[in-house]
Amino acid sequence: MASIRILIGSHLCNATRALREARALAETGHDVTIQGVWHDKKLVARDETMLPKVPFHFVPVVDLTRHGILPRLRRRLGVERWRRFRRFSPAGLGYGVREHLKLARAAEPDLTIVHSTGTLWVAAKLNELGRRVGVDFENWYSEIIRPEEALLHPVTEIRELERKLLRVAHYRLTPTRAMARALGEFAHVEAPHCVYNVFPLADLNAPAPPATDRRKPRVPSIHWFSGRIEPGRGLRALFGALPHIQYPVEVHLRGDLNRQDKAWFAKNVPAEWRQRIVMHPTVHNSELLPRIASHDIGLALESGATRGRDLTVAKKTFHYMLAGLAVIASDTTGHEEIAESTQGAIKLVQPDNPAALAAAIDAWLAFPEHLRLAKLAAVRATKEIYCWERVREQLLDEAALALAD
């Protein structure tokens, strides 16, 4: 079988899409290695806990927790070189970019698949050397940069890397059909294949401690989660909606709240809700599903403020559905793509519209039977359409074609 390298820009434990890809390819018989970057000691510990259990290899090309001075300096110089002089440096795209290239080049794999902005440059360089490369467009990288941030990033250079790789890569994936169509039109090529960011049904049977976040089991519960509790990701709309909700409900937020965001949080949460919002820290991925499942409604309120964000589906949307929650999601092109097929599991609301969000929440709280049916619809849609077992073969077919070409 083939030797395959998968390049990610961060920790293994946070790279759920690359993890599933690597596992599927390894289970088919390929020799798979993921190259990543370590920058956080807590996440290093999570990675090290995972490694004995996975059927592939993992190599951190840079470990910033031990030898961070030079890699951080290179990254800073790359960023400043662009910001001050408008001169492009691949180091400005992420940590360990050149280290990724050096290791992937020396390994001489049959296929190298990249998953981040910085590794786009690596794939382009490998292609120039005659190597076979692939790209998983987890995001449309040049199109997730907000207009006010554009001067800080080499958008044109990233866009040219994307266009080139869409034309030369042997393996091309996106997380939605809408993004696939848009990328195909952008590069004037056949659209990449869509593999949704869905989860395995087997996760429902994984051993995990029973967990509940709820205070009052008889009161319906809303759940929102992210790595950080910060401005954006729909929290402004949620806080604006809370005073307008007419029915009893618990609101649970999961994520880390750092010092700089605490002031924003205190200022924006309605005074009458400050003691009623339940805060939870992040947990290991293995603990997250049972905690989500203890709630009734999941919120996926990411705004489609950029074209890239509009075309994708928040991964948490599929996580909520796997856990059996009804979902209220922002009315983006990506969410529209899947909402109709869920047959009532997802309500779409205009992004950043507190009144619309409050009305959507109340519509389910007012009619508990409707909420129950929506939760059942989420389970049904997950089992029939939006699970890893349904899309795994699409990924393997794409890999087989890439390796046979």
Residue map of PLM features:
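Glycosyltransferase donor-sugar binding loop
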Residues: 39-41, 250-265
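Conserved donor-binding/catalytic core segment of Leloir-type glycosyltransferases
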Residues: 213-243, 252
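Nucleotide-activated donor-binding/catalytic signature segment of Leloir-type glycosyltransferases, i.e.
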Residues: 219, 255, 263-292, 297
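Conserved acidic donor-binding segment of nucleotide-sugar-dependent glycosyltransferases
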Residues: 341, 346-354, 363-369
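A charged, aromatic-enriched C-terminal amphipathic alpha-helix characteristic of glycosyltransferases
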Residues: 352, 366-399
